[in-house]
Curated annotation (Swiss-Prot):
Belongs to the V-ATPase E subunit family. It is a peripheral membrane protein. PANTHER family: ATPASE H+-TRANSPORTING V1 SUBUNIT E1A-RELATED. SUPFAM superfamilies: V-type ATPase subunit E-like (SSF160527). Residues 8-64 form a coiled coil. The modification N-acetylmethionine is found at M1. Keywords: Acetylation, Coiled coil, Hydrogen ion transport, Ion transport, Membrane, Transport, Vacuole. This is V-type proton ATPase subunit E2. One of its GO terms (molecular function) is proton-transporting ATPase activity, rotational mechanism. Subunit of the peripheral V1 complex of vacuolar ATPase essential for assembly or catalytic function. V-ATPase is responsible for acidifying a variety of intracellular compartments in eukaryotic cells. InterPro entries: ATPase_E_C, ATPase_V1_Esu.
């Protein structure tokens, strides 16, 4: 083999090595690009997933805040609604209390009312001896009806006539002073309080007490008629 053949063979080997190197380099480049693309996609998906998670979290926070705000507003509305009911009922009760003050002005009817209240109290107590308290201003009227009240009670209860003692040491409070409308002093619009002699059984039959009982018993109907359906029925 002469020098020309050797040189030619060497050149062929060089070209082969170079081609193989270029192919290997190209493979490496392609592989690297594929790995880069895969990693880039993974990073992109990870970023998208994080964004979705952040969005979902913030969306839930907004939803929770909306629910809290709605609940707060709903509770505030209910409180206002109930306050409006209370205001109307209180105004109605105050008006009725003022009307009670005029009951004792009608002497004849008030006299009959006192007798009825005494009889009713005796029927509740069913005691042979009782202590009666009234307003000092009503003492004479009470004295004028006691005997008739005792007789009617005895007939209804089919018992002997009870002993009724008027408490002349402690009277029920007087009516409120119209000149002092904001006064919180105890007052009584009329009526009587009867108790057993030992004080263990008491029947409060004042006009004010009866008004309180009537309002407690009729409060649901009063609220419905004055303000509307109860809050529970609107839900």
């Amino acid at each position: 083999m002469n020098d020309a053949d050797v040189s030619k063979q060497i050149q062929q080997m060089v070209r082969f090595i170079r081609q193989e190197a270029e192919e290997k380099a190209n493979e490496i480049s392609i592989s690297a690009e594929e790995e880069f693309n895969i990693e880039r996609l993974q990073l992109l998906e990870s970023a998208k997933r994080k964004l979705r998670q952040d969005y979902d979290r913030k969306l839930k926070q907004v939803d929770i805040r909306k629910r809290i705000d709605y609940s707060t507003q709903l509770n505030a509305s209910r409180i206002k609604y109930l306050q409006a009911q209370d205001d109307v009922v209180t105004a109605m009760k105050d008006s009725a209390a003022k009307d009670l003050l005029r009951v004792s002005n009608d002497k004849n009817n008030y006299k009959k009312l006192l007798k009825s209240l005494i009889i009713e109290s005796l029927l509740r107590l069913k005691e042979p001896s009782v202590l009666l308290r009234c307003r000092e201003m009503d003492k004479k009227v009470v004295e004028s009806v006691i005997e008739d009240a005792k007789r009617q009670y005895a007939e209804k209860a089919k018992v002997g006539s009870p002993k009724i003692t008027i408490d002349e040491k402690v009277f029920l409070p007087p009516p409120p002073n119209p000149k002092l409308p904001d006064s919180h002093d105890p007052h009584c619009s009329g009526g009587v309080v009867l108790a057993s002699q030992d004080g263990k059984i008491v029947c409060e039959n004042t006009l004010d007490a009866r008004l309180d009982v009537a309002f407690r018993q009729k409060l649901p109907q009063i609220r419905t008629r004055l303000v509307g359906a109860p809050e529970t029925s609107r839900a």
